[in-house]
């Protein structure tokens, strides 16, 4: 029995739609895996909102950095980036770096999410950069793939930047940086072998 043209046409459209959805989902999932931050709602910083790769709101962070909650250190696969509100006139709300001194592989953004630059400094072979704060830079996003024992950053908890959290290669929290770039502490220059990468947030 012959299949009516309308049914054949609708079946073709359905198959095409499924194929396009599969390709789009695959492309999406590949893109999402490139630069997610590694955190979860409990461990996320209070006052910061966390979003998926397509901009869907996931949750507000629950942990006060001055009184952190006992949270697991797993990465919520839904979370891709965060946005933290700025308190006007508060210089502590932003990270202090510049494009030259910024970590290679990390992207730096303004407070409204405008891309400023990619960091230029390889932690294994740092460039001779000034230590001034670029007023345009508010926060950074670094690929999770950098959390690798093959490319650890060279710092320690004392010398680490205040407002940045430091992690080992498997994502375990090590410490929060203690050094204010405007009033740096007298810290040793040794590399803590436990530290592999950092995540810096720009709210207090």
Curated annotation (Swiss-Prot):
Q: Show the Pfam families listed in the entry.
A: Prot_inhib_II
Matching InterPro entries, A to Z?
A: Prot_inh_I20 (IPR003465), Protease_inhibitor_I20 (IPR051391)
Cystine residue pairs: 28-100, 38-75, 41-59, 42-71, 48-84, 99-117
> Where would I find the sequence repeats?
25-67, 68-125, 126-183, 184-204
Keyword Signal attached: yes
What are the recorded GO MF terms, alphabetically? serine-type endopeptidase inhibitor activity
Entry-linked SUPFAM superfamilies = Plant proteinase inhibitors
What are the protein's UniProt keywords?
Disulfide bond, Protease inhibitor, Repeat, Serine protease inhibitor, Signal
Q: Where is the signal peptide?
A: 1-25
Member of which family? Belongs to the protease inhibitor I20 (potato type II proteinase inhibitor) family.
Under which name does UniProt file this protein? Wound-induced proteinase inhibitor 2
> From which source organism is this entry?
Capsicum annuum (Capsicum pepper)
Supply the gene name: PIN2
């Amino acid at each position: 029995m012959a299949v009516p043209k309308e049914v054949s046409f609708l079946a073709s459209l359905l198959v095409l739609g499924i194929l396009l959805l599969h390709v789009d989902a695959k492309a999406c999932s590949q893109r999402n895996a490139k630069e997610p931050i590694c955190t979860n709602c409990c461990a996320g910083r209070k006052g910061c909102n966390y979003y998926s790769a397509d901009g869907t709101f996931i949750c507000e962070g629950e942990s006060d950095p001055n009184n952190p909650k006992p949270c697991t250190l797993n990465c919520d696969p839904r979370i891709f980036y965060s946005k933290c509100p700025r308190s006007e006139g508060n210089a502590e709300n932003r990270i202090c770096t510049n494009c030259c001194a910024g970590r290679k592989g990390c992207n730096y953004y303004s407070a409204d999410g405008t891309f400023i630059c990619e960091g230029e400094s390889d932690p294994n072979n740092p460039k001779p950069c000034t230590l001034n704060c670029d007023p345009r830079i508010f926060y950074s996003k670094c690929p999770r793939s950098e959390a690798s024992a093959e490319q650890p950053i060279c710092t320690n908890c004392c010398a680490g930047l205040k407002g940045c959290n430091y992690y080992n290669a498997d994502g375990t929290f090590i410490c929060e940086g203690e050094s204010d770039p405007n009033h740096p502490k007298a810290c040793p220059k040794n590399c803590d072998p436990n530290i592999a990468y950092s995540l810096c947030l720009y709210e207090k």
